Amino acid sequence: MATTNGAVENGQPDGKPPALPRPIRNLEVKFTKIFINNDWHESKSGRKFATYNPSTLEKICEVEEGDKPDVDKAVEAAQAAFQRGSPWRRLDALSRGQLLHQLADLVERDRAILATLETMDTGKPFLHAFFVDLEGCIKTFRYFAGWADKIQGRTIPTDDNVVCFTRHEPIGVCGAITPWNFPLLMLAWKLAPALCCGNTVVLKPAEQTPLTALYLASLIKEVGFPPGVVNIVPGFGPTVGAAISSHPQINKIAFTGSTEVGKLVREAASRSNLKRVTLELGGKNPCIVCADADLDLAVECAHQGVFFNQGQCCTAASRVFVEEQVYGEFVRRSVEFAKKRPVGDPFDAKTEQGPQIDQKQFDKILELIESGKKEGAKLECGGSAMEDRGLFIKPTVFSDVTDNMRIAKEEIFGPVQPILKFKNLEEVIKRANSTDYGLTAAVFTKNLDKALKLAAALESGTVWINCYNAFYAQAPFGGFKMSGNGRELGEYALAEYTEVKTVTIKLEEKNP
């Protein structure tokens, strides 16, 4: 996962990351069907949809297009797998953890294949897919594998002749809807804790990027998870996504995506069976650079924080607040970084920025860039598409940005860095919190008092101090306000996938 300076830590026993392998340029896509009950199925409608390589705009393949009847079939399989007495329910907790470890082993074995598929489907650099996405996926499966036999209740002292204790039980059938920006990693964030706790899953990958989810399904079958435990239905939001969100036999849903769609998911969940909902939504994240900060570190982290993954991150540092004493120097260095950022073929090991995911996202970003120009921000570099490069956008930096500009208010989800100026801490706290979002924030300062004050005052689910995008499977992640609710990762994620049952037993006499 990303470290303080945008590099990657690997966690290998010798501390050395594996060498970057060559991508598999002519990789055959083997898995394109719906995965239910450990078998591959054609859609009941007979429809298919195409998935495209954003880098070349060429069609990769066609994938079976699921719909409500396919979701119903998947839920039926998941329910059967969760029934008392089923192979999955009879499996002890230690064995569940071993299956997750074995799944991580197979992901490690096929890491180059999965990274290649991710790069083909998303356009993200192979370097990042291999060292960030796949590394995080493997670590997430291993982390929750370790938790499987450690989920336990408590004995509760009472003032009566009873024994009182709690049981933490799996919820049942869990729905999951994953985004296109980190397809496999976000799948792992949802699948690993759900399986760790003993649930079954019906998952919809984003229609733009279904290929790694379907490949993972083949590994789930190879490992030996019982039929029906994991079911994957590719398709579109208004059909498959809506069917999962509103299904009366799905007991919990986890969604990562836009705030607008998150509202629809919550509404559908409420109208159906009041299923439990975890939402990880958008962000307009402040990155605060104080005058006493290590400017080299702050510039690099802010750069990686907004341009990583083509800017297509809910955690993007999309509002950089810089104290006025160092504002000019920060802008100058940021422009230098942006101009040097390698943009191009995502399979080239030197590339750090690939294309945007699709034409819709590409057009939205360019429209917001134009709004920045019209509203008076100073365009320092970039500001347009790459010539003759399809969906590629030049790394863009704006200075003299004010809070009322659209680029300072709206989630751009692209390679655009708006830099704002502030005078003092109280001012920047108020401005940073003046948003409907509250996903992440970052602070750069050498002063511990400032760091702690800002960490407490910022209305965000995560605050990074002198680092950015520092994710760990052990650390909970989620948002305040309209950035969502619930937590993924860490011990906190287990509560999202378990029900707490209180058991009280009457005794003849009080135990001492």
UniProtKB/Swiss-Prot annotation:
InterPro entries assigned: Ald_DH/histidinol_DH, Ald_DH_C, Ald_DH_CS_CYS, Ald_DH_CS_GLU, Ald_DH_N, Aldehyde_DH_dom, Aldehyde_DH_NAD(P)
Site (Transition state stabilizer) residue list: 181
Subcellular location: Cytoplasm
Keywords assigned: Acetylation, Cytoplasm, Lipid metabolism, NAD, Oxidoreductase
Region described as Disordered: 1-22
GO molecular function: 3-chloroallyl aldehyde dehydrogenase activity; aldehyde dehydrogenase (NAD+) activity; aldehyde dehydrogenase [NAD(P)+] activity; NAD+ binding; protein homodimerization activity; retinal dehydrogenase activity; thyroid hormone binding
Biological or metabolic pathway of the protein: Cofactor metabolism; retinol metabolism
Its EC number(s): 1.2.1.36
Residues that bear N-acetylalanine: 2
GO CC annotations on file: cytoplasm
Function: Catalyzes the NAD-dependent oxidation of aldehyde substrates, such as all-trans-retinal and all-trans-13,14-dihydroretinal, to their corresponding carboxylic acids, all-trans-retinoate and all-trans-13,14-dihydroretinoate, respectively. High specificity for all-trans-retinal as substrate, can also accept acetaldehyde as substrate in vitro but with lower affinity. Required for the biosynthesis of normal levels of retinoate in the embryonic ocular and nasal regions; a critical lipid in the embryonic development of the eye and the nasal region.
PANTHER family found in the cross-reference section: ALDEHYDE DEHYDROGENASE-RELATED
Protein name: Retinaldehyde dehydrogenase 3
